[in-house]
């Protein structure tokens, strides 16, 4: 793979780190709800609370983790985050009461709030430098980074399901072991000082961020995409249940999405890099996502069931995944061009926190929409309208290094 061979040792470390992060995470978390409900006997609302607290402690605190990265550097953030994840997973494996489970999942979420902004912001910064050295568009690096994460998300549940034949504690300890290995690898290989990265001591970064309209517009558009993506876990299960009478086909649809993302991310990004800039890549991706919802909306009045009933859902998953492959690398590539000098970590964290808040609010509204008893096509048409409206939110300004030949200053 030409892109991989051209990467610097630091970029290779960061890409492999994303793979390991997701293997360790997805080996445990997909099985948490079932463990809490069956093995521990928690009520459904308590399980929901626990899962919500984990999401909040991660997405909600990304902006804090980004500030930590800008102030203290990538290495301390990654090492601290990995150490917290090891403790959190080990604790979760032995937790058997509500308060201990909550403490463990808060640590698990806080860990990601530290190491994810560190890795994501440094990958974006290094991708800009890689581009400026003449290796090609930065989106190729970020596409490889996204594909590695998807590969980890695909392999993690397989590892977890295998270990779950022993028990949940073994699965948690295996997840902790993955992060021990990541911790050891970064302690040995991550530079103490990364050339070009300067710690930011000045205050006022959040105030400047809140006045950065192009960046906030991008956050809102990205939040609309994430809200649409979240329908994989909200609207899609209902559609599969309606069409087949069970949710057994969901696992196959999720596997299809993961395999498509792993195998197609780099070719799609290379195609988009030759033809589209950053804004147009995101816009086309959002329109593909909208088309996925529209496919289901068009088919719902026919009320197909069985294998035929799964065809619209499959089309939705395929179009959503294609949109994702355009949106995610382009968004990450655009952030450095909208960022104040020395604040890339803060802005990377804010992208996740702001969009996560949009998903939190929008998911509740989406759930109500699906429960209102409207004509079957209406909820899907409303969901299709959201990505279309998000296109109008995309900033109208110079795209920087979106395509070959463009330039941008590293941050």
Predicted segments, located by residue:
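A membrane-interface helix-boundary motif in multi-pass transporters
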Residues: 164-177, 368-387
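A late C-terminal transmembrane helix in Major Facilitator Superfamily
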Residues: 338, 342-373
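Helix-to-loop junctions at the C-terminal end of transmembrane segments
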Residues: 61-73, 263-278, 370
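Conserved MFS/SLC helix-loop-helix module at the cytosolic interface between two early adjacent transmembrane helices
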Residues: 59-96
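C-terminal transmembrane helical hairpin of 12-TM major facilitator-type secondary transporters
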Residues: 279-328
């Amino acid at each position: 793979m030409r892109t991989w061979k051209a990467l610097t040792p630091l970029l290779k470390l960061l890409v492999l780190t994303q793979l390991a992060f997701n293997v360790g995470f997805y080996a445990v978390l997909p099985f948490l709800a079932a463990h809490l409900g069956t093995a521990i006997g928690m009520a459904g609302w308590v399980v929901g609370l626990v899962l919500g607290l984990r999401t909040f402690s991660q997405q909600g605190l990304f902006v804090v983790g980004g500030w930590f990265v800008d102030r203290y550097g990538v290495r301390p953030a990654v090492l601290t985050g990995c150490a917290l994840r090891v403790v959190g997973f080990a604790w979760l494996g032995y937790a058997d009461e509500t308060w201990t489970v909550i403490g463990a999942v808060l640590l698990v979420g806080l860990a990601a709030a530290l190491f994810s902004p560190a890795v994501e912001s440094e990958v974006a910064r290094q991708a800009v430098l890689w581009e400026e050295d003449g290796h090609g568009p930065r989106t190729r690096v970020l596409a490889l980074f996204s594909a590695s994460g998807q590969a980890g998300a695909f392999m993690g549940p397989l590892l977890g399901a295998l270990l779950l034949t022993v028990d949940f504690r073994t699965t948690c300890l295996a997840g902790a072991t993955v992060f021990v290995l990541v911790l050891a690898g970064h302690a040995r290989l991550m530079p103490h000082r990364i050339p070009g990265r300067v710690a930011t001591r000045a205050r006022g970064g959040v105030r400047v961020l809140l006045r950065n309209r192009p960046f906030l517009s991008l956050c809102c558009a990205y939040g609309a995409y994430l809200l649409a993506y979240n329908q994989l876990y909200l609207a899609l299960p209902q559609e599969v249940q309606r069409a087949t009478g069970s949710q057994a086909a969901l696992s196959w649809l999720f596997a299809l999405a993961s395999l498509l993302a792993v195998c197609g991310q780099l070719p799609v990004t290379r195609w988009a890099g030759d033809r589209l800039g950053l804004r147009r890549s995101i816009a086309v991706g959002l329109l593909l996502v909208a088309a996925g919802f529209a496919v289901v909306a068009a088919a719902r009045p026919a009320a197909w069931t069985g294998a035929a009933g799964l065809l619209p859902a499959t089309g939705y998953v395929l179009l959503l995944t294609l949109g994702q492959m355009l949106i995610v690398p382009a968004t990450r590539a655009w952030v450095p061009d909208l960022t104040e000098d020395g604040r890339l970590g803060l802005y990377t964290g804010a992208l996740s926190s702001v969009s996560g808040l949009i998903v939190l609010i929008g998911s509740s509204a989406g759930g109500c929409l699906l429960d209102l008893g409207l004509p079957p096509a209406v909820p899907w048409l409303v969901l299709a309208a959201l990505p279309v409206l998000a296109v109008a939110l995309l900033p109208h300004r110079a795209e920087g290094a979106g395509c070959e030949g463009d330039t941008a200053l590293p941050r």
